[in-house]
Amino acid sequence: MSHPSPAGKPSNSKNPRVFFDVDIGGERVGRIVLELFADIVPKTAENFRALCTGEKGTGPTTGKPLHFKGCPFHRIIKKFMIQGGDFSNQNGTGGESIYGEKFEDENFHYKHDREGLLSMANAGPNTNGSQFFITTVPTPHLDGKHVVFGQVIKGLGVARMLENVEVNGEKPAKLCVIAECGELKEGDEWGIFPKDGSGDSHPDFPEDADIDLKDVDKILLISEDLKNIGNTFFKSQNWEMAIKKYAKVLRYLDSSKAVIEKADVSRLQPIALSCVLNIGACKLKMSNWQGAIDSCLEALEMDPSNTKALYRKAQGWQGLKEYDQALADLKKAQEIAPGDKAIQAELLKVKQMIKAQKDKEKAVYAKMFA
């Protein structure tokens, strides 16, 4: 008989907790903390716990360490699940359990009735090994076929980041890896707060913060704090860290926007726009021209007449040597703010670049037909 998933997190304080520190494309994005339902499926939970600690040594079937460390999420299907656990072949064809190559389905007590559930991947009945998946939506068609044995209690935002990684088919285009993993004992910190020395005291993902996302004043307070930290990194020319903090602001704002009244959304818009523009500025400093253009386009969706976005977008086009595109954006900006001297100076510079480019082309043609 199946039962609904536990409403509380954690469902049982005596159940083991484990963690994954996740890297996407070589960059640490955060920690997922999982409760294992040892009270309901002890054998399945123990298998996963030991694979997180690596305490069982080498697997007799694979000849590889029975450990998730360094193991990729090899399969991602948006609005379905993220899958990993193949520590031997790293492509979905390998892995093994701590009990041998495979072990039986323990029970189907819990349903796949929401996101954030941890369940065993298999190749049919009684073929559990080391591979697992985390649901990102309810998946009722898997009930009675896959053993649900845990749940995400912190770091659901990290799971969502994995879910939204670009894929080729079902394979992530960027390497998504369990960089570190282990068990959290009673009294251990869960590791969801940043430790970057910036003074940032907020969890990286709003889902993990003990706040009411409908409290707009609180969200604005947190957002201003994070933005100021981002500005400090910007001033010290630490562009990557600045982007991380501005992006974190946007996560908090987006989570709040999803649950508040439309009238309150407008209160969040100015700081959101500012952070998107600042991300664009950082990308310009990093010579990430297309990234800067994309950020400016995002800003222009919020405010189509924003001259700062048009100006920075033009700088991105210049980096790509698309001077005609840059000229078009600067002309739009000048129409909106005809007295802006910075726009005028940039416009003159781009016109000179276009002239120099044309003169160079003429010289090439002249040599060809001389």
Curated annotation (Swiss-Prot):
<dbReference type="InterPro" id="IPR029000">
    <property type="entry name" value="Cyclophilin-like_dom_sf"/>
</dbReference>
<comment type="similarity">
    <text>Belongs to the cyclophilin-type PPIase family. PPIase D subfamily.</text>
</comment>
<dbReference type="GO" id="GO:0016018">
    <property type="term" value="F:cyclosporin A binding"/>
</dbReference>
<keyword id="KW-0539">Nucleus</keyword>
<dbReference type="GO" id="GO:0008134">
    <property type="term" value="F:transcription factor binding"/>
</dbReference>
<protein>
    <recommendedName>
        <fullName>Peptidyl-prolyl cis-trans isomerase D</fullName>
        <ecNumber>5.2.1.8</ecNumber>
    </recommendedName>
</protein>
<dbReference type="GO" id="GO:0043066">
    <property type="term" value="P:negative regulation of apoptotic process"/>
</dbReference>
<dbReference type="GO" id="GO:0071492">
    <property type="term" value="P:cellular response to UV-A"/>
</dbReference>
<keyword id="KW-0413">Isomerase</keyword>
<feature type="repeat" description="TPR 2">
    <location>
        <begin position="273"/>
        <end position="306"/>
    </location>
</feature>
<feature type="region of interest" description="Interaction with HSP90AB1">
    <location>
        <begin position="214"/>
        <end position="370"/>
    </location>
</feature>
<dbReference type="GO" id="GO:0051879">
    <property type="term" value="F:Hsp90 protein binding"/>
</dbReference>
<dbReference type="InterPro" id="IPR011990">
    <property type="entry name" value="TPR-like_helical_dom_sf"/>
</dbReference>
<feature type="repeat" description="TPR 3">
    <location>
        <begin position="308"/>
        <end position="340"/>
    </location>
</feature>
<keyword id="KW-0053">Apoptosis</keyword>
<dbReference type="InterPro" id="IPR002130">
    <property type="entry name" value="Cyclophilin-type_PPIase_dom"/>
</dbReference>
<dbReference type="GO" id="GO:0005737">
    <property type="term" value="C:cytoplasm"/>
</dbReference>
<feature type="modified residue" description="Phosphoserine">
    <location>
        <position position="5"/>
    </location>
</feature>
<keyword id="KW-0697">Rotamase</keyword>
<comment type="function">
    <text>PPIase that catalyzes the cis-trans isomerization of proline imidic peptide bonds in oligopeptides and may therefore assist protein folding. Proposed to act as a co-chaperone in HSP90 complexes such as in unligated steroid receptors heterocomplexes. Different co-chaperones seem to compete for association with HSP90 thus establishing distinct HSP90-co-chaperone-receptor complexes with the potential to exert tissue-specific receptor activity control. May have a preference for estrogen receptor complexes and is not found in glucocorticoid receptor complexes.</text>
</comment>
<dbReference type="GO" id="GO:0043065">
    <property type="term" value="P:positive regulation of apoptotic process"/>
</dbReference>
<dbReference type="GO" id="GO:0045070">
    <property type="term" value="P:positive regulation of viral genome replication"/>
</dbReference>
<dbReference type="GO" id="GO:0005654">
    <property type="term" value="C:nucleoplasm"/>
</dbReference>
<dbReference type="GO" id="GO:0005829">
    <property type="term" value="C:cytosol"/>
</dbReference>
<dbReference type="GO" id="GO:0005634">
    <property type="term" value="C:nucleus"/>
</dbReference>
<dbReference type="GO" id="GO:0000122">
    <property type="term" value="P:negative regulation of transcription by RNA polymerase II"/>
</dbReference>
<feature type="domain" description="PPIase cyclophilin-type">
    <location>
        <begin position="19"/>
        <end position="183"/>
    </location>
</feature>
<dbReference type="GO" id="GO:0006979">
    <property type="term" value="P:response to oxidative stress"/>
</dbReference>
<dbReference type="Pfam" id="PF00160">
    <property type="entry name" value="Pro_isomerase"/>
</dbReference>
<keyword id="KW-0677">Repeat</keyword>
<dbReference type="GO" id="GO:0015031">
    <property type="term" value="P:protein transport"/>
</dbReference>
<feature type="region of interest" description="Chaperone activity">
    <location>
        <begin position="185"/>
        <end position="215"/>
    </location>
</feature>
<dbReference type="GO" id="GO:0019899">
    <property type="term" value="F:enzyme binding"/>
</dbReference>
<dbReference type="GO" id="GO:0005730">
    <property type="term" value="C:nucleolus"/>
</dbReference>
<dbReference type="GO" id="GO:0030331">
    <property type="term" value="F:nuclear estrogen receptor binding"/>
</dbReference>
<feature type="modified residue" description="N6-acetyllysine">
    <location>
        <position position="171"/>
    </location>
</feature>
<dbReference type="GO" id="GO:0006915">
    <property type="term" value="P:apoptotic process"/>
</dbReference>
<dbReference type="GO" id="GO:0061077">
    <property type="term" value="P:chaperone-mediated protein folding"/>
</dbReference>
<dbReference type="GO" id="GO:0034389">
    <property type="term" value="P:lipid droplet organization"/>
</dbReference>
<keyword id="KW-0802">TPR repeat</keyword>
<dbReference type="GO" id="GO:0051881">
    <property type="term" value="P:regulation of mitochondrial membrane potential"/>
</dbReference>
<keyword id="KW-0007">Acetylation</keyword>
